[in-house]
Amino acid sequence: MQLNWKESGLRWYWVVVVVFLADQLSKQWVLANFDLYESVKLLPFFNFTYVRNYGAAFSFLHDAGGWQRWLFTAVAVGFSVLLTIWLRKQPANMVRLNLAYTLVIGGALGNLIDRLQHGFVVDFLDFYWNTAHYPAFNIADAAIFIGAVLIIIDSFKASSSDDKAIKE
């Protein structure tokens, strides 16, 4: 039986819009107000630092010659379409999984727009301790990470409840 959009996980698509807009507006602000590598200290462990990421997480494949832009574009589109199809099939009351999927989609689309528009992703959230810096990231990256963690948690919760059902 097909669920209509109100009964399905598509009801959660507003999260995609919120993540996408927050990500894109924050990146536009950085581009308008920072020079490349400019840094502003906000807290003793946190800066806004404008950097360009030509790769994926942790600058993976950043120096691969340009083809990686299209690979990451295809991956973002593919995952966004796949997760949207899954949302369509999910009941709206599966909160954790629907939230996870929409966070990943919003983040993937935010970084996709950067890749298509600039050829790189704008990163600016810079956490550090003393001289050790975590790689800079953005709101889209954070949404993807949180969504992935929620998917993992959901898979453990689901397998745990499956185990209980088998024992009964």
Curated annotation (Swiss-Prot):
GO biological process: proteolysis
Keyword Cell membrane: yes
EC number: 3.4.23.36
Transmembrane segments: 12-32, 67-87, 93-113, 136-156
Active site feature: D123, D141
Pathway of action: Protein modification; lipoprotein biosynthesis (signal peptide cleavage)
GO terms for MF: aspartic-type endopeptidase activity
Annotated S-S bridges: none
Entries under PROSITE patterns matching the protein: SPASE_II (PS00855)
Bilayer topology annotation: Multi-pass membrane protein
Keywords: Aspartyl protease, Cell inner membrane, Cell membrane, Hydrolase, Membrane, Protease, Transmembrane, Transmembrane helix
GO cellular component: plasma membrane
Pfam families: Peptidase_A8
Catalytically driven reaction(s): Release of signal peptides from bacterial membrane prolipoproteins. Hydrolyzes -Xaa-Yaa-Zaa-|-(S,diacylglyceryl)Cys-, in which Xaa is hydrophobic (preferably Leu), and Yaa (Ala or Ser) and Zaa (Gly or Ala) have small, neutral side chains
Subcellular location: Cell inner membrane
Protein family according to the UniProt entry: Belongs to the peptidase A8 family.
Described purpose of this protein according to its UniProt entry: This protein specifically catalyzes the removal of signal peptides from prolipoproteins.
Protein name (Swiss-Prot/TrEMBL): Lipoprotein signal peptidase
Organism: Shewanella amazonensis (strain ATCC BAA-1098 / SB2B)
This protein's encoding gene: lspA
